[in-house]
């Protein structure tokens, strides 16, 4: 490439995102517990909608996403005009950075927060500001102290990935109220459906004009392979995001499958209940053999080891047993492994394998 051809500032500072591993060399049918996927997959109704969509593949999709937006609004009690849909919640995050951040502005997030916050900030030339957490949990005071007149966006995953920890409504309200007037609080609710009774910040959005929420169909809805997400916020902000959204960013298959998925809340409830049961079981089983974790409110636990060497050695042992979990050194947690909550057999299998590893030490 010619020296005269250069990308915008910040682009070359982006480290390529690496998703959870899917395969282990020499191991057939390894069990993937590295990407926080729903072990039960999508709703049967969503699968039926997916198959029906093949009959209209020659047609362009809707540009306004009306069917999906209204379904989301009906289920959550929202104004459909204030719902925006994207290619995963990642795209909504990207839209927010494109619209509100840029050179000489700051984008704030916590030290163990989702990697896409940093990537999206750098992509628009903004300055990523990483704020320390307190025992792997969001520290509201630290976030507020990091805000300046340059702050434009504050991203907060609640529950957080990869820690699984979360803060309550009172702290969220205090954070929103304490931000500079020009800053938007973005509540990433990718794992919100795993928390009974949690509105992921919806009430806060109605009370304030500086809060936006993002959600995804990749987790409890089991549609990670389709890439569908959505956001909700003040009408003025959603209008801005729609101005930079591509007119055909979602296919008919994505739209109709996601609509069927969100309407099947019985499937969501079953998945949430099963996840809660086995998340508690796995955390307790690992704690008994000397592998603690913080209380997780998501569909994974963050297992803590004595040091980086032990975590990496355990990961290698699990791979020999056909089990794939996620190293999280990229999240500044090199002594930890993130383990997706699978079905009963998967949880028992991973607990047995880690117990076997600890006995060999």
UniProtKB/Swiss-Prot annotation:
<feature type="modified residue" description="N6-(pyridoxal phosphate)lysine">
    <location>
        <position position="219"/>
    </location>
</feature>
<comment type="similarity">
    <text>Belongs to the class-II pyridoxal-phosphate-dependent aminotransferase family. Histidinol-phosphate aminotransferase subfamily.</text>
</comment>
<keyword id="KW-0808">Transferase</keyword>
<protein>
    <recommendedName>
        <fullName>Histidinol-phosphate aminotransferase</fullName>
        <ecNumber>2.6.1.9</ecNumber>
    </recommendedName>
</protein>
<dbReference type="Pfam" id="PF00155">
    <property type="entry name" value="Aminotran_1_2"/>
</dbReference>
<dbReference type="InterPro" id="IPR015421">
    <property type="entry name" value="PyrdxlP-dep_Trfase_major"/>
</dbReference>
<dbReference type="GO" id="GO:0004400">
    <property type="term" value="F:histidinol-phosphate transaminase activity"/>
</dbReference>
<dbReference type="InterPro" id="IPR050106">
    <property type="entry name" value="HistidinolP_aminotransfase"/>
</dbReference>
<dbReference type="InterPro" id="IPR015424">
    <property type="entry name" value="PyrdxlP-dep_Trfase"/>
</dbReference>
<comment type="pathway">
    <text>Amino-acid biosynthesis; L-histidine biosynthesis; L-histidine from 5-phospho-alpha-D-ribose 1-diphosphate: step 7/9.</text>
</comment>
<keyword id="KW-0032">Aminotransferase</keyword>
<dbReference type="InterPro" id="IPR015422">
    <property type="entry name" value="PyrdxlP-dep_Trfase_small"/>
</dbReference>
<dbReference type="InterPro" id="IPR005861">
    <property type="entry name" value="HisP_aminotrans"/>
</dbReference>
<keyword id="KW-0028">Amino-acid biosynthesis</keyword>
<dbReference type="InterPro" id="IPR004839">
    <property type="entry name" value="Aminotransferase_I/II_large"/>
</dbReference>
<comment type="subunit">
    <text>Homodimer.</text>
</comment>
<dbReference type="GO" id="GO:0000105">
    <property type="term" value="P:L-histidine biosynthetic process"/>
</dbReference>
<keyword id="KW-0663">Pyridoxal phosphate</keyword>
<dbReference type="GO" id="GO:0030170">
    <property type="term" value="F:pyridoxal phosphate binding"/>
</dbReference>
<keyword id="KW-0368">Histidine biosynthesis</keyword>
């Amino acid at each position: 490439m010619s020296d005269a051809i250069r990308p915008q500032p910040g682009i070359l500072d982006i480290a390529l995102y690496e998703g959870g591993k899917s395969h282990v060399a020499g191991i057939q049918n390894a069990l993937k517990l590295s990407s926080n996927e729903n072990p039960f997959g999508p709703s049967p109704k969503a699968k039926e909608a997916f198959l029906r969509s093949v009959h209209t593949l020659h047609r362009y999709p809707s540009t306004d996403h009306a069917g999906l937006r209204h379904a989301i609004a009906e289920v959550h009690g929202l104004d459909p005009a204030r719902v925006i849909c994207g290619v995963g919640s990642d795209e909504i995050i990207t839209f927010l950075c494109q619209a509100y951040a840029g050179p000489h502005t700051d984008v704030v997030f916590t030290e163990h927060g989702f990697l896409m916050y940093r990537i999206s900030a750098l992509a628009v030339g903004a300055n990523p500001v990483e704020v320390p957490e307190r025992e792997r949990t969001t520290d509201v005071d630290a976030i507020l102290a990091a805000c300046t007149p340059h702050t434009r966006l504050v991203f907060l995953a609640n529950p957080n990935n990869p820690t699984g920890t979360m803060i309550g409504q009172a702290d969220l309200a205090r954070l929103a109220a304490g931000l500079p007037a020009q800053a938007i609080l973005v509540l990433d609710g990718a794992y919100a459906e795993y928390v009974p009774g949690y509105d992921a910040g919806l009430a806060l959005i109605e009370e304030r004009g500086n809060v936006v929420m993002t959600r995804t169909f990749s987790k409890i809805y089991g549609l990670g392979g389709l890439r569908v997400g959505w956001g909700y916020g003040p009408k003025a902000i959603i209008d801005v995001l729609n101005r930079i959204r591509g007119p055909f960013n979602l296919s008919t298959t994505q739209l109709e499958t996601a609509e069927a998925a969100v309407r099947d809340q019985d499937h969501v409830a079953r998945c949430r209940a099963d996840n809660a049961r086995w998340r508690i079981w796995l955390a307790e089983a690992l704690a008994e053999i000397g592998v603690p974790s913080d209380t997780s409110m998501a569909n994974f636990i963050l297992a803590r080891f004595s040091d980086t060497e032990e975590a990496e050695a355990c990961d290698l042992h699990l791979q020999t047993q056909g089990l794939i979990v996620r190293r999280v050194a990229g999240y500044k947690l090199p002594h930890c492994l993130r383990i997706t909550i699978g079905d009963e057999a998967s949880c028992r299998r991973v607990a047995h394998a880690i117990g076997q590893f600890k006995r060999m030490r």
